[in-house]
Amino acid sequence: MSFIAIIPARFASSRLPGKPLADINGKPMVVRVMERAQASGADRVIVATDHQGVVEAVERAGGEVYLTRPDHQSGTERLQEVIDRYDFPDDRIIVNVQGDEPLIPPQIILQVADNLAGAEAGMATLAVPITTAEEAFNPNAVKVVVDARGYALYFSRATIPWDREGFARSREHLSHSLLRHIGIYAYRADFIRRYVSWSASPLEKIEILEQLRVLWYGEKIHVAVSSVAPGMGVDTPEELAQVRLLQQQLD
């Protein structure tokens, strides 16, 4: 499988300022993510950042990095600048690896690239089963509903599908399967170029979910169930502390 992994690494973060450079047992977070992506078998791994400090950290670690404009509204827009700068061909598979996933299993990165290659869709992603009621009703856990062939019908922060009879009896136990979306994407370069030309959709503004723009404009997203459990992401100081402990066990 031939693909390029790009890691958008925006320096500003409302809940964890300077997140890409946060130290995780002797290495910046962005370097931890880069090393995971390099282990996936990607032909090339590029960090895309708006901050010179991140550029220097990646270069010190021997990685490839590109300094983007600071005014991008999303990670996908940052990707688009990179693919245009390097003039990647339209059919090149690009995997968007989130810059705050220092424990992401390399297998997931390869799997989402494989998923796109075998699907009739402009975009591919992954999901995992939801096993607890707490997660099912957590708006920070994005749910996805798919059709019989695995193509996304809708993504939502709400609990979908809603089990009318089951939840009427109890909301403590799940009587049907739900899927939680994992924020990793694969697309071909031409799809990214088209995506950034579309205006933001009403649904994505309501849910604050960028992927809803794809469905709004009639495109398909294929969703596969992840082959392994995803690693823990980092959005808060508390999560950073947890990831440091987990990484210590791996080092």
UniProtKB/Swiss-Prot annotation:
GO molecular function: 3-deoxy-manno-octulosonate cytidylyltransferase activity
Subcellular location: Cytoplasm
InterPro entries per record: Cytidylyl_trans (IPR003329), KdsB (IPR004528), Nucleotide-diphossugar_trans (IPR029044)
EC identifiers of the protein: 2.7.7.38
Protein's job: Activates KDO (a required 8-carbon sugar) for incorporation into bacterial lipopolysaccharide in Gram-negative bacteria.
Catalysed conversion reaction: 3-deoxy-alpha-D-manno-oct-2-ulosonate + CTP = CMP-3-deoxy-beta-D-manno-octulosonate + diphosphate
SUPFAM superfamilies linked to this entry: Nucleotide-diphospho-sugar transferases
Pathway annotation: Nucleotide-sugar biosynthesis; CMP-3-deoxy-D-manno-octulosonate biosynthesis; CMP-3-deoxy-D-manno-octulosonate from 3-deoxy-D-manno-octulosonate and CTP: step 1/1; Bacterial outer membrane biogenesis; lipopolysaccharide biosynthesis
Top-level taxon of origin: Bacteria
GO annotations of cellular component type: cytosol
Pfam families per the UniProt record, alphabetical: CTP_transf_3
Coiled coil stretches, renumbered: none
UniProt keyword Signal, yes or no: no
Protein's GO biological process: CMP-keto-3-deoxy-D-manno-octulosonic acid biosynthetic process; lipopolysaccharide biosynthetic process
The keyword Cytoplasm belongs to this UniProt entry's keyword annotation: yes
Main location per the UniProt record: cytoplasm
Native source organism of the sequence: Sodalis glossinidius (strain morsitans)
Alphabetically ordered keywords of this record: Cytoplasm, Lipopolysaccharide biosynthesis, Nucleotidyltransferase, Transferase
UniProt name for this protein: 3-deoxy-manno-octulosonate cytidylyltransferase
Annotated family: Belongs to the KdsB family.
Top-level EC class as recorded in UniProt: transferase
